[in-house]
Amino acid sequence: MASAETPNPDAEIPNTDAAAAADPAAAAPAAAATDPAAAGSPSPPLPPRKRRLSPTPSPTRRSSRSRSRSPRRGRSRSRSRSRSRGRSASPRYPDGKRRRHNDLNVEVCRDFLRDRCARADIECKYAHPHPTVAVDRDSKVTACADSLRNNCFRGRTCRYYHPPPHIQESLLRSIGVEDPKVKMQVCRDFTRGRCSRSANECRFLHHSPLEDCAIVCQDFLRGRCDRKSCRYSHVMAHPMPPPMRDIPMQYPDMVYMPPPAPLGVPMMMPPPSAPAAFSGNNYGVEVCRDYLKNMCNRESCRFAHPDLNNEVMNTQVEVCRDFKRGECNRPACRFYHPPASSNSIG
């Protein structure tokens, strides 16, 4: 009777891994014999856990991330653009300060409002506005920016305040502009109609109140006025001085213009069709300022008394050369015809 064989623990177990490494073809039947499930089936795929831990991301994920981030960047750019457009830089004064809207406001004299002020407008430190000037609830008036540049052609119809020189100086100082002419003392003889010197000859300032200012004809400025007896002024003073061009713009609804013209007539730029200034020749005669205000009582005035047909430029008129020779036949000559008793032209 055969006895059952007992396994020997010391027996050597064949190493299938080493055999597979040495001979893969021979190891395949052995693997199939030991593991029936592995026979005839391919090797299982890598687990998904290892795919997630892949060091290099797939290009599809890169594109998806860039696509998802692109709209956010576009929105942020549009917001920044809209904010930059809305926050526009406000105008600044020459000294770098921001502009203030009350720099042209002047307090009205309370005694003047009650008809009790005994001081003249050139002596009182408060405003004496014209009846056409609008006074706000705080008893303040807004100075005419055009009058600060001698370029207000509205005259007595202007609804803004035309300040005298001493108030002009404080207004110009508040906006950072210095005008040496404003600091000149006002000629008292001129205010009484007694000064025989012209504005260029007198060492004092010839200041004319708003009541004496004439309204410049707008058609004349455009070269279109054909009226023989125009009720508006056809007078143009010299252009504005260069320092006054640096005054910053403050009120967009007002044409920003330095102190009232000494003529009593606002300073205007010449129209495109106007001839060049003739101050350098011998035929230029300065216009009488008192005559423009209907205050000249001199019998033989050495200044010109032009009519409505004469062209006035740089406070002067040009004498008609044909008239001096006795040959002018124009019915409405634009040049000045001096009277026989006049000694203004030699």
From Swiss-Prot:
Entry keyword annotation includes Zinc: yes
Region described as Disordered: spans on this chain: 1-99
Compositionally biased intervals (Basic residues): 62-86
Molecular function GO labels: DNA binding; RNA binding; zinc ion binding
InterPro entries, A to Z: Znf-CCCH_Muscleblind-like, Znf_CCCH
Residues passing through the membrane, by range: none
Single GO BP term: regulation of RNA splicing
Zinc fingers (C3H1-type), renumbered ranges: 103-131, 138-165, 181-209, 211-237, 282-308, 314-340
Protein name: Zinc finger CCCH domain-containing protein 28
Record lineage: Eukaryota, Viridiplantae, Streptophyta, Embryophyta, Tracheophyta
